[in-house]
Design a protein with these regions (language model features):
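Intrinsically disordered, low-complexity, compositionally biased regions/tails
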Residues: 8-10, 168, 202, 215
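Generic domain-boundary/flexible-linker signal
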Residues: 37, 79-82, 110, 174
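Conserved short beta-strand elements that form part of the metal-binding/catalytic scaffold
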Residues: 1-21, 63, 69-78, 120-157, ...
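Surface-exposed interaction/gating patches
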Residues: 91-138
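Generic secondary-structure microfeatures
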Residues: 117, 146, 167-169
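Vicinal oxygen chelate
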Residues: 2, 15-92, 95-104, 124, 132, ...
């Protein structure tokens, strides 16, 4: 299943045998896939770019960064693209705003994404040693991974950390989530901040400062919500 906000698309895939669940990977659309391929081959010759199966409506190629994080690479007009990825653009009041990953070498990876994809690089408001790259609408935050951030809770490996959304009215959003929970209790977000370990994990999330409201989806993927500036 694919959903989108008129600019960013997201695929929600069933978990198959041997595959991880959760926030698995992201994708980047470029104007010229071959130009990206040339930049990667020149500076990162050990990084491989492979063809994805033809039934993927969201990706033509698979690639990874120097830390091994896999992501999709696509270009408008490629024959395998379909669904929300070819539905055109539109504006809406609730939209994707960012995503974040925690990594051992944030500066190294920030330089990779900035150089290969020609994205402006800035310091992230998430804290010391964090970086942000944006195309003007969607932002990637690269956060330092430190084992001490997980003191008092379960330790998570360096990986994608959370999704971020921007809404026009945070109070209205919270009300809608509550109404959805009443209509269908199975749609209730997974509880966060429950017990000592849950509280420690939630506090780690809040320290990023990338949201005003924090929750998790039904599968446990962490989500940061922020109200749009008017």
């Amino acid at each position: 299943m694919s959903i989108g906000d008129g600019y960013v698309g997201m695929n929600i895939n069933p978990r198959m045998a041997g595959r991880q669940a959760g926030f698995d990977h992201f994708g980047i659309q470029v104007e010229d896939v071959e130009a990206v391929r040339e930049r990667v081959a020149k500076k990162y010759p050990k990084i491989e770019i492979i063809q994805r199966p033809s039934n993927r409506p969201f990706a033509a190629l698979g690639i990874h960064d120097p830390a091994g994080q896999y992501f999709d690479l696509s270009q408008a007009g490629l024959k395998n693209r379909a669904e929300v990825y070819e539905a055109g653009t539109w504006e809406q009041k609730r939209r994707f705003s960012h995503f974040a990953m925690r990594v051992i070498e944030p500066e190294r990876l920030a330089e990779f994404y900035a150089g290969v994809f020609e994205l402006p690089l800035t310091n992230s408001p998430a804290g010391d040693g964090a970086f942000a790259l944006t195309d003007g609408r969607m932002t990637m935050h690269i956060l330092p991974w430190k084992i001490s951030d997980f003191l008092g809770t379960g330790i998570e490996r360096p990986a994608l950390d959370h999704l971020g959304f921007e809404v026009d009215d945070l109070a209205a959003f919270k009300k809608d989530v509550e109404e959805l929970r009443i209509v269908n209790p199975l749609m209730m977000p997974k509880p966060t901040g429950v017990g000592a370990e849950g509280e420690a994990r939630l506090n780690t999330f809040k320290r990023t400062g990338l949201g005003e409201h924090y929750l998790a989806d039904l599968d446990g993927v962490m989500i940061a919500i922020k109200e749009a500036k008017h």
